[in-house]
Each structure stands twice: as C-alpha cells, then as structure tokens.
Amino acid sequence: MTEIAKNTNFNKASKAKNDEFYTQLSDIERELKHYKKHFKDKVVYCNCDDPRVSNFFHFFSYNFEKFGLKKLIATCYKNQSMDLFSQNKSEQAIYLVYEGDKNGNMVPDPAEIGIRELKGDGDFRSKECIELLKQADIVVTNPPFSLFREYVAQLLEYDKKFLIIGNGNSITYKEIFKNIQDNKIWLGVTKPQLFLIDNKENFAKYCSWIFR
C-alpha cells in the first residue's frame, strides 16, 4: 500500500464509528521504558481496553513488580469474540484489578486478577468509570480517535497524568495544540504503529504518544 493510500484510509477510519486500533506490545515496550521511574507506587488505569487481550494490560501486569506499581485497573466493553475489541456491542462490561504477584511465580495468574462486572457499558464517560478514574495516578491507553478531544478533556478535568496514543491530526486540534504550546502536554519519544482491529490493515502513517 502506498503512503498516500495509507494516509487516506487512516483519515477515513479516524472519522468512522469503528475506529478501534490495535497497539503492538513492542510499541508499548519501546515507549514505556522511558518512564519507568514515574510509575513507582502508582495506580495505573487503562480505560479503553479489553484487558483479556489488551497489550497494555499484558505489559503492566507482567511488569508490575519491575515498575513498582501499586495497582492496575482496566475497564472494557465485553467482547463477543476474544480476539476482537468492541464498543457497545455486548450485554456486560467488566473491569479487572491486579495488585501484584501473590504466589511468588512473578506471573499474573488468573486467580490473582479480580474480575468485576460494571453496571453500565464500560464507557469511559460513565459515572462508574469516572469513579475508577479518580483512583488512578496515571492513565495509559489507546483511546478511540473519534473521541480523542473529549477523552483528553476528561483527563485534564480530573487532573490526571497520562500516556496515550493519538493520530497525527490530534496534535493539531486547538485544544491539544494549546496545551502543547503551554508545556502542559508533551509528545512521546517513539512513534507507535497501529493496526485497524477489523482487518489488521496497517493505517499507521503517523501516530504519536502524548503524555502529561
């Protein structure tokens, strides 16, 4: 696929309702290694992920002790299929809580991960998800691009530290760009390469990590 075609498809996807993108574990590892000291004794919240298949939850649960985390929380829309993310497509949303290794094998076993049902659909804007957000010190995830402005506005409203992924256009949004100009938000070190969930086609001509 040409670069022009990639960019065109990416822009179309970011405007569509189905704008869920898959984040590679390797991209998470490459970026997160630069922030290790900032996670010590912190509660991390991943609120746009399916923790059963999310590489964000995988990374933080397997590096819980290495990063010195206090708690890991992840919310999601429950999926019809275990290998796909979904949005408002299922009858029950869940959230997971992991507080570290208990049996000494340094692996996040199922018995060590608390699985709890949400009353609503798992939307990050819902009251119960906001209550979980209030517990968090740092939010790390890949939010839907179509809701990026609203998503960042919420994080700023609740004065949260965050490390999230946005598409190339997101840094030009006036709300985002103003915060970058004012040194309230910064661009990350690496460039993630995202894949559209539905067909795994590469749309990542340009994406950025954004943090506060």
Predicted region positions:
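Class I S-adenosyl-L-methionine-dependent methyltransferase catalytic core
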Residues: 1-212
